[in-house]
Amino acid sequence: AYDFCVAKGIALTPNYSDIWIQEQGPEVVFPVVNSNPNKTSAWEYTTRPASVSRDKSYSNPTWEFVKSFPMLDGKQYDDPSSKYYVGDEQALLKSFWQNRDPRFNNVCLYNGREYPVAGKSANYRQYNALGISSPDDQYGVNPNAHTNAVNNDIFSGFYIYKAADLTLTQDKVMTYDIDYILMRFAEVMFIYAEAANETGHSETAVEM
């Protein structure tokens, strides 16, 4: 499969963030082809914050997912040998966006992050804090006011940024038709490397 893909000119996408939005990109092996209006995807309107969508988001990154993302040096946040070591989970809550693997910002939208979505100002930021954000987006607890956001049982306070089509205005989110990638070249390489390692060809696995 690897040799077949290489022979067909399939290769890794240079920019990670382009993998999900570049249709028929160099890394695509098996896609689900979408084309508005005949076939659209629910991805955009089920992952965006409600204030810029047509409904509340139903697919959200969890805190466990955010914690699991490596730091800039590839190590976990609680690894004492990491240059970016964070002592505990409570400390990470206050700095989870700092010194992370660059892919983190290509995957997660979080409170206070710049969000250049169509229909908003060029420097628009997405908030979910009580008293600051749109009520539809609010998440968390205000202990001083003894108030909880009404969305705490609906979503996690994080949103998916991956594969977002930020050129779509709020009224167009249901026309999202970017192809969905079922398999990309990186997965073929991982499978090849795993098979090589399991059959005693560790050097091939490392090179892959």
What function would you assign to each model-found segment?
Residues 1-7, 30, 96-98, 104-109, ...:
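Extended, hydrophobic/aromatic-rich amphipathic alpha-helical segments that build helical scaffolds
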Residues 1-140:
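An aromatic- and glycine-enriched ligand-binding surface/loop that stacks and positions planar moieties
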Residues 12-16, 169-177, 197:
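Acidic, serine/threonine- and proline-rich low-complexity regulatory regions
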Residues 136-184:
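Active-site beta-strand/loop architecture of penicillin-binding DD-peptidases
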